[in-house]
Amino acid sequence: MDFSSIEQNLNNFKKLVAGNSDKAQITPVLVQLKLAATIHLEKPTSLSNVSDKVKKDLVLAREILELISLYSIKIKDIDSFERTFNQLKTYYYDYKSIIAPSTLEYQIIGLNLMRLLAKHKTSEFHSEIELIEFNNLDNSFIKFPLLVEKSITEGSYNKIIQSRSGVPSEYYQVFLDILADSIKEDIANCSEKSFKTLSLKDAEKVLLFNDNNQFQQYIKERNWKVQGDVIQFGNNDNQTVEIPSLQLIHQTLHYAKELERIV
């Protein structure tokens, strides 16, 4: 596959994604682009005396991987995003001395930071931060996940909440949704360990459900028993509760409410 054919496939991919085409149309083009980025486009054997042709191939391969990573988030295929980002790291860090930075670089690095936060991979988050040059930590795409991480650590979540416009790009919403769902699970687990009963009204409010049907479905998924208007958790009086229930629930509820304002 020659360079012009790869460019043509990439332009076709952009049009299909922008037009919200279905996966059946996009997948064949996507497969061809993945092959192009990994096999057909040339990589340097060393970082010295790199030819213009190889540099041109690197830039195109990077763009392909960047657009695939954003598409992966769009269709909520987080595993695909992770795999593609790991490929991109070579272009962002190893090849930075031979090709100019991409305009999408910090957005995608920031999205990976959000992925790590959403998956509770704190140590990996800090390892990735160490790879970023200090003067780029104030980049809006990097600053947002840093503020989210700081707020999680401190519990002062209001610091990151200003308005929806505070989110650097629409792709960040996907990871905020994952994080919000994770918080709901934490609240539910905390409630089960801390209380013998909880009213349906309070539970729906605490878990931030705006749709009662979804709330009822969640109750079924958790196998909670409902008697009248009360959820029975069935805790034993002698059960040791290691979680400071009210404090954690109130703190987590505040955090979840603030995240809901972003989402």
UniProtKB/Swiss-Prot annotation:
Keywords: Developmental protein, Proteasome. Residues 79-248 form the PCI domain. The keyword Cell inner membrane does not apply. It holds the Pfam family CSN8_PSD8_EIF3K. PANTHER family: 26S PROTEASOME NON-ATPASE REGULATORY SUBUNIT 8. Acts as a regulatory subunit of the 26S proteasome which is involved in the ATP-dependent degradation of ubiquitinated proteins. Belongs to the proteasome subunit S14 family. This is Probable 26S proteasome non-ATPase regulatory subunit 8. The gene is psmD8-1.
